[in-house]
A protein has these predicted regions:
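N-terminal glycine-/serine-/threonine-rich phosphate-binding loop
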Residues: 1-9, 30-42
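Solvent-exposed alpha-helices and their adjacent loops that cap or buttress functional pockets
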Residues: 2-3, 85, 131-136
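Structural motif
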Residues: 9-12, 143
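Glycine-rich beta-strand-to-loop/alpha-helix junction loops that act as flexible
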Residues: 11-16, 53
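Short, solvent-exposed loop/turn segments at secondary-structure junctions
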Residues: 18-20
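Short glycine-enriched, charge-decorated loop/helix-capping segments at active-site entrances
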Residues: 23-29
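Ligand-binding beta-strand-loop-alpha-helix segment within the catalytic cores
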Residues: 46-115
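Glycine-rich, aromatic-bearing surface loops/beta-hairpins
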Residues: 91, 95-159
């Protein structure tokens, strides 16, 4: 199903993996800026809210626009992501969004994982894999997902 305007797109990205290093070892601000620009272009085109996952040092908190947090009732946390505590893409997002804030948890409708950063904790309950024609960005493996409402009921239920 096509994304709907107002939905949330979560992205986790290891720029270390993108440039061919192990996750968390060699972040790249240059790669982060290029990736963020591409993500912003796509999310703007489709009217989606972008949420960028920080690294495990910030408990995988997320950088997003204050407007998204207000709409979805996400609670803000007090932290400023930087390259070595949050990740390069999170730092770029924080410095680039109109009104950037950091939140601890969300339930996104769609997701893209660049470099196996493990975004599953921020997706809605029923996750459906999306097969992409492009399997990598640089040296980083791409994994994409969408979500759907859970099916409830038993043998009498109609969907």
């Amino acid at each position: 199903a096509a994304p709907k305007p107002g939905q949330v797109f979560v992205v986790g990205c290891s720029t270390s993996e993108v440039i061919g290093s192990l996750i968390g070892t060699a972040g790249s601000m240059e790669a982060a800026q290029s990736i963020f620009a591409a993500l912003l272009k796509v999310t703007s085109k489709h009217g989606l809210y972008l949420a960028v996952q920080c690294c495990e040092h910030l408990n995988r908190s997320l950088v997003t626009e204050a407007e998204a947090a207000e709409k979805y009732c996400w609670e803000e946390v007090a932290v400023k992501p930087v390259a070595h505590a949050g990740g390069s893409l999170a730092q770029v997002a924080y410095n680039s969004f109109r009104q950037a804030i950091v939140v601890e948890k969300i339930s996104a409708h769609l997701g893209l994982d660049i470099g196996q950063t493990l975004i599953g904790m921020h997706l809605r309950r029923v996750v459906v894999p999306v097969r992409l024609s492009q399997k990598e960005i640089g040296a980083a493996v791409l994994t994409a997902a969408r979500t759907r409402p859970p099916y409830v009921g038993g043998e009498r239920a109609v969907y």
